[in-house]
């Protein structure tokens, strides 16, 4: 027989999960290297229809920091739903079988992770990166 989860229990679970994510974020920051992945742009080298210049690196994504941001966003979401200001709205949504807070958090954090995964697999062009983030967030 399973124990029923109460509102107070759910608040406690969210706080514990938030602390866990913060600890994971700190561990990732402490253990990560300075490995980065490039974000590039390609510009035309001449009139329309001609060739493109070689891609240039706009900036580099620090992988460890990006993973830490992903974990930090999740921790922040747990603390927000456990906060006095939003907990009532969170519980009302769950009672109505809706979890708006989690969907908003997932749309952002999963987009960060999907962009990082796409970079690891070789996607580096800024237009593609922005599109991937936007499409994923919109789902």
Which stretches of residues belong to each language-model region?
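Transmembrane alpha-helical core residues of multi-pass small-molecule transporters
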Residues: 20, 135-136
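Structural signature of hydrophobic alpha-helical transmembrane segments
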Residues: 68-69, 125-135
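N-terminal topogenic module of multi-pass integral membrane proteins
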Residues: 2-94, 100-106
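Helix-coil boundary and interhelical linker segments in multi-pass alpha-helical membrane proteins
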Residues: 55-59, 114-130
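Internal, conserved structured core segments that host functional sites
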Residues: 105-119, 134
């Amino acid at each position: 027989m399973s124990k029923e989860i109460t509102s107070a229990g759910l608040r406690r679970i969210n706080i514990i999960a938030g602390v866990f994510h913060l600890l994971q974020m700190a561990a990732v920051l402490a253990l990560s290297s300075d490995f980065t992945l490039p974000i590039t742009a390609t510009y035309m080298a001449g009139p329309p229809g001609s060739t493109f210049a070689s891609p240039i690196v706009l900036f580099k994504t620090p992988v460890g920091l990006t993973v830490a941001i992903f974990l930090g966003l999740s921790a922040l979401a747990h603390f927000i739903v456990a906060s006095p200001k939003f907990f009532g709205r969170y519980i009302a949504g769950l009672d109505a079988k809706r979890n708006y807070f989690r969907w908003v958090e997932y749309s952002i954090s999963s987009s960060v992770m999907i962009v990082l995964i796409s970079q690891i697999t070789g996607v580096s062009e800024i237009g593609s990166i922005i599109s991937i983030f936007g499409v994923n967030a919109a789902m």
